[in-house]
């Protein structure tokens, strides 16, 4: 028997608490497939599910890539070949999940998003997953997904700047991730710093207007923006 929407949400929470994120994804995909607007809670559950299944594999990929470089430095060709095969396996899993979430966003989530907040949330998500794609791809494929990430972040930013307060956690989270995109994917530290500084300055100016319900979330992201700015400006100073 197919689970009801309420059951899927409850099962998704159980899967989250037991750290069974692959199952959490499946339950939230069932909710998304109903093609109605997700509640804030449902939206967050879906986001957490994909973030964890992809996050663990991104971490694995970084470790394996680092080990591959170490073996290359030692000139151990046999180990390098084995590691390359293993890295390819992780990349296949990453591609599968990125394709999966991007399809859900395009087919189920964005067509049913009626508020600016939900549109920004999903376009930001789209930018994020194309960015993750760009981390492990090369050449033409990397260029293609980087362009799509840039387009999604840009559209999200336009809606966000028009309709969300500078202190809104989703607007701040978007600025944080978009600036990371410029720094890590485009290798444009100046643009990354400019974007992060603008978001930080705009939110500081309106800090007294932050509703109590989102104060903690907003200030946490503001701190992350400031941390990145500190790191990036010291990095560029070191290079000079």
Swiss-Prot record:
Keywords for this protein: Cell projection, Cytoplasm, Phagocytosis
Gene3D superfamilies found in the cross-reference section: 14-3-3 domain
Task: List localization entries.
Answer: Cytoplasm; Cell projection, Phagocytic cup
Tell me which GO cellular component terms the UniProt record holds: cell projection; cytoplasm; phagocytic cup
Task: Give the record's GO biological process terms.
Answer: phagocytosis; positive regulation of cell motility; positive regulation of phagocytosis; protein localization; signal transduction
Effect of gene knockout? RNAi-mediated knockdown reduces the rate of phagocytosis and motility. Coactosin recruitment to the phagocytic cups is impaired.
Major subcellular site? cytoplasm
Q: Which SUPFAM superfamilies match?
A: 14-3-3 protein
Q: Does the keyword NADP apply?
A: no
State the InterPro entries in the record. 14-3-3, 14-3-3_CS, 14-3-3_dom_sf, 14-3-3_domain
- Please give the subunit comment from the record: Interacts with coactosin. Interacts with ACTO/actophorin.
Q: What does this protein do?
A: Adapter protein which is required for phagocytosis and motility, probably by regulating actin cytoskeleton dynamics. During phagocytosis, plays a role in the initiation and/or formation of the phagocytic cup and is involved in the recruitment of the actin binding protein coactosin to the phagocytic cup.
Family affiliation: Belongs to the 14-3-3 family.
Tell me the protein's name.
14-3-3 protein 3
Lineage, please? Answer: Eukaryota, Amoebozoa, Evosea, Archamoebae, Mastigamoebida
